[in-house]
């Protein structure tokens, strides 16, 4: 496998072409952003930790029947993945009220929800990734109803697998966001990453936040939170 030119650079990752048309290399950066890019900074070795965390979690999900774009971890910062067309939706899963949902609905952070909440945001930086529903998504051509059904079914399974896995490490999975992609044959697969950048992790005993909220809210010890998550899931 030969790494070629950069195809795309996002807030946290770079994507490179390879000598295989259907494979890409994803490089994880240390750059950190919050509030739709309004707050910017760096977290030491964040890219290394997120690459390792995502690789471990995607491998676990694959073993439990979830199709992903992940092929293998190449080194500390890079992984080899299937080339996919990203569905322009972020799927947000909320098990406990926190963050923007708590603020939007006037709920105290940490309030247990009577059911898991699934939300969509439309991936558009200029618009600030607005919340939309499935009808909006179909109306603007982001996905079909059939694709949305597949995505929601996969997301529910992913949530159950991750909640159980993290509970074993004394971590509550409060909420998270994931993305999906379409392979050349139209197959929907889990893409992007699962890491402290994209999840809220609270220690089940102390309630300590072990995720990017430490950067977002200036709580300090940001790197330590990422290290702790990697340490617990690496057992």
UniProtKB/Swiss-Prot annotation:
Entry keyword ATP-binding: yes
Catalytic reactions of this protein: 5-amino-1-(5-phospho-D-ribosyl)imidazole-4-carboxylate + L-aspartate + ATP = (2S)-2-[5-amino-1-(5-phospho-beta-D-ribosyl)imidazole-4-carboxamido]succinate + ADP + phosphate + 2 H(+)
Any one biological process term the GO annotation gives: cobalamin biosynthetic process
Pathway per the UniProt entry: Purine metabolism; IMP biosynthesis via de novo pathway; 5-amino-1-(5-phospho-D-ribosyl)imidazole-4-carboxamide from 5-amino-1-(5-phospho-D-ribosyl)imidazole-4-carboxylate: step 1/2
Entry's Gene Ontology molecular function annotations: ATP binding; phosphoribosylaminoimidazolesuccinocarboxamide synthase activity
InterPro entries hit by this protein: SAICAR_synt/ADE2_N, SAICAR_synt_PurC, SAICAR_synth, SAICAR_synthetase, SAICAR_synthetase_CS
A Pfam family recorded for this sequence: SAICAR_synt
UniProt xrefs under Gene3D superfamilies: ATP-grasp fold, B domain, Phosphorylase Kinase, domain 1
Keywords per UniProt: ATP-binding, Ligase, Nucleotide-binding, Purine biosynthesis
EC number: 6.3.2.6
PROSITE patterns with a match to the protein in the record: SAICAR_SYNTHETASE_1, SAICAR_SYNTHETASE_2
Disulfide bonds: none
Family note: Belongs to the SAICAR synthetase family.
NCBIfam families listed in its UniProt record: purC
The protein's name: Phosphoribosylaminoimidazole-succinocarboxamide synthase
Species in which this protein is naturally found: Clostridium botulinum (strain Alaska E43 / Type E3)
């Amino acid at each position: 496998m030969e790494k070629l030119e950069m195809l795309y650079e996002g807030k946290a990752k770079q994507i490179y072409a390879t000598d295989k048309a259907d494979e890409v290399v994803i490089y994880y950066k240390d750059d950190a952003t919050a509030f739709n890019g309004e707050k910017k900074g760096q977290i030491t070795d964040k890219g290394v930790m997120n690459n390792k965390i995502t690789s471990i979690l995607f491998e676990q999900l694959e073993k439990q029947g979830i199709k992903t774009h992940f092929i293998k971890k190449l080194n500390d910062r890079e992984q080899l993945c299937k080339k996919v067309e990203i569905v322009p939706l972020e799927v947000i899963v909320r098990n406990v009220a926190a963050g923007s949902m708590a603020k939007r609905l006037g709920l105290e952070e940490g309030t247990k929800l009577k059911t898991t909440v699934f939300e969509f945001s439309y991936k558009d930086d200029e618009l600030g990734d607005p919340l939309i529903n499935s009808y909006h998504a179909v109306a603007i051509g982001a996905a079909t109803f059939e694709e949305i059904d597949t995505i929601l079914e996969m997301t529910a399974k992913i949530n159950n697998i991750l909640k159980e896995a993290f509970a074993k490490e004394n971590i509550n999975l409060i909420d998270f966001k994931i993305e999906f992609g379409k392979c050349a044959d139209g197959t929907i697969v889990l893409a992007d990453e699962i890491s402290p950048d994209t999840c809220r992790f609270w220690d089940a005993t102390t309630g300590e936040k072990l995720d990017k909220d430490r950067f977002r809210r200036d709580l300090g010890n940001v790197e330590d939170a990422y290290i702790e998550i990697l340490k617990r899931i690496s057992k």
